[in-house]
């Protein structure tokens, strides 16, 4: 076989392969178009578009509904979700025996506020008669058709209205327009001040001051002061003053004065006057009047009236009425009875009083110390200093006065040196 025959065979095989691929592609397109036509052959083709099948038209419909890990994240697998819900003794603590559980549920005026006394509560629930009688728009065009240019007293108004016409006479087409048809009443197609398709002060499809599909001051689909889908002063899906999904003064998912996920005056995930994750008047993670992570009137991480990390009325890191790092009425870095009453920046323990220097140590006074004064020596070793009463001293020591005195002294010394040098020169000459 020659080279030409080999080339011919290869070209023939290539053409057959390409032809089969083209046929398969056409079959797939025809099948997909047929399925698409079948799926959109309902009465309302837009209704089913992208609802239950992830199609090319609307792939966003199912995106993140059940397959997204963020949807199920922390709902059942997270240990924080089940923490303390049924097994923890804190879960049942104070639910039925604690007076705080029933506090404000029926006796609290906030519970009944606006439920029956609020005029918005009864608005449109049983009848809207008062509004209809008083509202001039209600009777507009119901029993009489008023004409501003042609009052009832004019003869033109009654002309030809009830008189019998002769056999050959014909009325003008404009005469009967709107007299007994549905066009005589406002609204698009309906009657009595309707919305688009309904009746009697409706929304789009409903009745009596409704939302889109419901009744009686509803939300989108519900009834009676609802949210989007719920009933009776609800949130988005719940009932009775709810949050997004819960009930009865809830947070986002919980119940009964909750936070986001918890119950009974909780924080974000906790219970019973909690912080974010804790319980019983907690901070962010702790319990019982805590700070962020601690307990009992804490700071950010500590406990019992703490600062940021310490305990018991602390500063930032210390304890018990501290400064930033120390304790008990300290300065910035000192501890335990440090320089109470005007201490310096770093002063410690029994510093001297009144007019200490900038870096003085040991035997420095307590009050009005300098910037970096430090600990006094032991009581047995320290020397006593005479405290000068500034008010009684006629010439108190100050930095400015000391400087002037030093200048005067130097001037005198310089003058003496000059005089001595002049005397020496005179003797030499």
Swiss-Prot record:
Recorded superkingdom: Eukaryota
Region (Disordered): 230-429
Modified residues (Pyrrolidone carboxylic acid): 234, 242, 250, 258, 266, 274, 290, 298, 306, 322, 330, 343, 356, 369
Composition bias, Basic and acidic residues: 230-371, 392-429
Main location: secreted
Residue positions assigned to the propeptide: 23-233, 239-241, 247-249, 255-257, 263-265, 271-273, 279-289, 295-297, 303-305, 311-321, 327-329, 335-342, 348-355, 361-368, 374-429
Signal sequence, renumbered to the chain: 1-22
Location within or outside the cell: Secreted
InterPro entries found in the cross-reference section: Antho-RFamide, FMRFamid-related_peptide-like
UniProt key word Repeat: yes
The keyword Cell cycle appears for this protein: no
Function: Not known but it could act as a transmitter at neuromuscular synapses.
Protein's name in the database: Antho-RFamide neuropeptides type 2
